[in-house]
């Protein structure tokens, strides 16, 4: 088999599928190569005893109507095909060092009110924290992207420390740990994690943390369906084993199926 495509995407995780949707809907010939049996990457779900269990994305923020993630899903053409359910009012519970359970509440007003009720002496610092997190989070709004700029107001916080910012806002060691309690969501490391990452994750979830009823495999399936509708191709069970080049230009991908076959797809762009 030998086919030519405008774009070849290696891997069908969320990023690969999103690229496939955007490029195929613009009329490009897209082929996605995936070594697993089904597309999705960390979006894949599995079933045990009649229950669907997600492997990677358990909940996602900014999925409320008008939220930036919801707008992206609508742009991809899948927003209305997914069963999106908001999490409970207390969308997350953190327990730093086993010192008790502390809820993260939906909405900035409730988030601030709840933490202030637990740490009344830190009211001003909690307010400062919320204001800055919201400011950074709003820097990736849809209107910013429409202007052709990439989060110009927030990128400067990539060089700021999340831990230092939290320490500047509040003095109580326990509250500092509570505010940093979601760091596993972004692989947070005290010495290195930037304020930008911390703010984007917490802002997104405070604004609109939701889950996908039936599992996140539905996201992958819906994106894959859009790609095929736009004429794209998704090859599953196909491992990319080599890139072919001519001079300094990549010209194709070689696919290997054990020792039995090797298929080369020629393309001008590899993602």
Region spans (language model):
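Helical element adjacent to the flavin cofactor pocket in flavoenzyme catalytic cores
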Residues: 199-250, 254-256
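Rossmann-like flavin
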Residues: 97-193
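Single conserved hydrophobic/aromatic residue that forms the stacking wall/gate
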Residues: 261, 265-271
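Generic recognition of stable, solvent-exposed alpha-helical segments in well-folded globular domains
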Residues: 18, 64, 68, 110, ...
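General beta-strand structural signal in soluble alpha/beta enzymes
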Residues: 34, 53, 177-178, 235-236, ...
């Amino acid at each position: 088999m030998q086919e030519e495509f405008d774009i070849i995407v290696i891997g069908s995780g969320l990023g690969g599928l999103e690229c496939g949707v955007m490029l195929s809907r613009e009329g490009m010939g897209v082929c996605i190569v995936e070594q697993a049996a089904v597309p999705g990457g960390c979006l894949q779900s599995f079933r045990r005893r009649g229950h669907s269990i997600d492997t990677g994305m358990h909940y996602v923020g900014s999925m409320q109507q008008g939220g930036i993630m919801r707008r992206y899903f609508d742009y991809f053409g899948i927003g209305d095909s997914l069963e999106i359910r908001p999490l409970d009012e207390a969308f997350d519970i953190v327990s730093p060092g086993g010192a008790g359970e502390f809820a993260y509440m939906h909405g900035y007003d409730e988030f601030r009110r709840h933490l202030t009720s637990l740490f009344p002496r830190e009211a001003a610092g909690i307010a400062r924290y919320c204001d800055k997190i919201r400011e950074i989070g709003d820097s990736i709004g849809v209107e910013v992207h429409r202007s052709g700029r990439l989060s110009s107001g927030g990128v400067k916080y990539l060089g700021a420390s999340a831990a230092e910012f939290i320490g500047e806002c509040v003095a109580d060691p326990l509250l500092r740990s509570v505010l940093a309690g979601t760091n596993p969501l972004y692989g947070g490391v005290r010495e290195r994690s930037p304020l930008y990452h911390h703010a984007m994750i917490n802002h997104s979830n405070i604004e609109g943390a939701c889950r996908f009823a039936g599992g996140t495999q539905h996201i992958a399936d819906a994106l894959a369906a859009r790609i095929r509708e736009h004429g794209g191709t998704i090859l599953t069970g196909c491992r990319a084993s080599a890139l072919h080049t001519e001079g300094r230009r990549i010209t194709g991908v070689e696919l290997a199926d054990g020792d039995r076959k090797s298929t080369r797809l020629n393309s001008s762009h590899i993602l």
